[in-house]
Amino acid sequence: MEHEQHHSSVNGVLHHYKEGIGSFTNQIPEIAETYNAFTQACFQEGSLTKREKQLIALGISLATQDEYCTIYHTKGCLDQGCSDKEILEACGVSAAFAGGAAMSQTVTLVQECLTELKNHKH
């Protein structure tokens, strides 16, 4: 997905992803349900907090250049109470690891997500 084609908004991208998951689940529920159970278990509170797990997931999303997951986990970080500074610091760690690709996503997509998601709380 190109940065300029964000379905007109970050929330639009999240909605598009949820629609896709719904369609996928309808077609092959046994795989979707197993995958969803696995990911839910991974993000439960444990030795790491849910908040720490979201920050890690955001960093991985940036390093792998996965824009849907970057948006999803930026929202997850906000939902878990992370500050902008904490989010950007985690992004900085990802940039140190992954280099320029992560930094370019941080200075554009993540900052846009922070602005839009915080201004459109449900």
Indicate residue ranges for each PLM-predicted region:
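Acidic, glycine/proline-rich low-complexity segments that act as flexible tails and inter-domain linkers
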Residues: 1-52, 105-122
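Amphipathic alpha-helical segments within well-ordered protein domains
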Residues: 39-40, 57, 74-78
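Residue-level detector of well-ordered alpha-helical segments, enriched
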Residues: 51-55, 69, 86
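Alpha-helical scaffold segments that form or flank carboxylate-/histidine-based iron centers
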Residues: 53-61, 90-95
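Short, thiol/selenol-centered motifs that function as redox-active sites or metal-ligating centers
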Residues: 56, 60-72
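Iron-sulfur (Fe-S) cluster-binding segments and ferredoxin-like electron-carrier domains
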Residues: 73-84, 113
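Polybasic, low-complexity binding patches
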Residues: 84-88, 121
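C-terminal structural segments of small proteins and small subunits
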Residues: 88-112
